[in-house]
Design a protein with these regions (language model features):
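Active-site nucleotide/adenylate-binding loops and adjacent lid/helix of ATP-dependent enzymes
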Residues: 2, 7-12, 92-181, 189, ...
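A short beta-strand motif that forms the metal-chelation/ATP-contact edge
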Residues: 6, 61-65, 194-197, 251-266
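Conserved N-proximal alpha/beta basic substrate-recognition cap immediately N-terminal to
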Residues: 10-121
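Short amphipathic alpha-helical segments and helix-helix/interface helices
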Residues: 27-31, 73-78, 103, 131-134, ...
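Short, well-ordered alpha-helical microsegments
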Residues: 51-52, 72-75, 127, 166-167, ...
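Short glycine-rich anion-binding loops that position phosphate/pyrophosphate groups of nucleotides
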Residues: 69-71, 147-149, 261
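Phosphate-binding site of ATP-dependent enzymes
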Residues: 155-236
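A long amphipathic alpha-helix within ATP-dependent nucleotide-binding catalytic cores
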Residues: 180, 207-255, 259, 267-269, ...
């Protein structure tokens, strides 16, 4: 196997519902910016490399930037890291975005994170608990979310307004072989989408309001929003990341989700430059100068 300077790995098609082109383009454009800096960049699809034994038996690349998320790829990519390759995002950072890891990490480190817990999708063990949740004054609705990776199909994230709806969502997960789900309290307010690059030094940040909502435009501190978002990213060790937050009527900000390397669709051109600059800052000088 020929040793490569930089290698880009696209996201799995399954993990790009309605975003296949957008996910493809942000990685491709990032690579083009790096090529413009005189670096050799090659791209591969995860399906290409997952089935190739020869792929993993050769020398690892010096640097890989990747959007793939499945464990069948993360495990061998971790071996690349152990052999000295630089991965952006790192394998552990990507794993940290699996909700069964993310929920405990962010619940313990953040002041404003919605009450969230992992629950069994076997509703036989949930009947009394579900009834009690909605009997309590002021409780509900709740979000039911897939416990590991982010959206792969409709129903992976949905709002339940009654115990019956929670039960139906859990049963749907169980029918797909998903043993656990996340039960997360709903926070009322303006829903904001977030994008970030970097952890310290030169960083890049953008936000926008989600579509399809009755927007109240509650006032809030953009500095506080940025600080909270980057704090969460550092907790998970993410370098290229996206997320969602809610701004309440009182101006409080709750981070409700964070993920590795989103599509950056509306900011694709400037985001690709920011990501490439970040990657360049992580490349050993001996590679950058070759």
């Amino acid at each position: 196997m020929i040793r490569r300077s930089l290698l880009g790995i696209f996201r799995e098609t399954l993990h790009s519902p309605e975003r296949i082109f957008d996910d493809y383009e942000i990685l491709r454009l990032t690579g083009e910016v790096l090529r413009g800096e005189g670096l050799e960049v090659k791209f591969f699809r995860p399906e290409q490399i997952a089935r190739s034994i020869e792929w993993w038996s050769g020398s690892p690349p010096d640097v890989a930037f990747l959007m793939c998320e499945q464990e069948r790829l993360l495990e061998p990519l971790g071996e690349w890291e152990r052999q000295g390759a630089i991965l952006i995002n790192s394998v552990e950072a990507i794993r940290n975005t699996y909700r069964y890891r993310m929920i405990p990490l962010l619940s313990a480190s953040m002041e404003r994170f919605p009450a969230s817990e992992l629950i069994s999708t076997d509703t036989r063990f949930q009947e009394s608990r579900l009834r009690a949740l909605f009997r309590r004054s002021g409780r509900g609705p709740f979000w039911i979310k897939r416990v590991d990776v982010h959206n792969t199909q409709p129903g992976d994230v949905s709002l339940a307004r009654s115990a019956d709806e929670v039960r139906a969502r859990l049963a749907a997960f169980k029918s797909r072989g998903v043993a656990q789900a996340v039960l997360q309290e709903h926070i009322e307010g303006d829903l904001v989408k977030l994008y970030g690059v970097g952890q310290s030094g030169e960083t890049w940040f953008r936000w926008l309001y989600h579509k399809d909502q009755v927007l109240k435009r509650h006032r809030f501190s953009e500095e506080a929003l940025r600080g909270m978002f980057f704090e969460a990213a550092r907790t998970l060790d993410l370098e290229v990341f996206g997320g969602d937050a809610v701004v309440t009527s009182g101006g409080s900000i709750y981070l409700i989700d964070i993920n590795a390397w989103p599509s950056f669709a509306l900011f694709r051109s400037e985001a690709s430059v920011a990501i490439a600059r970040h990657i360049l800052s992580r490349i050993p000088e001996t590679i950058a100068a070759s």
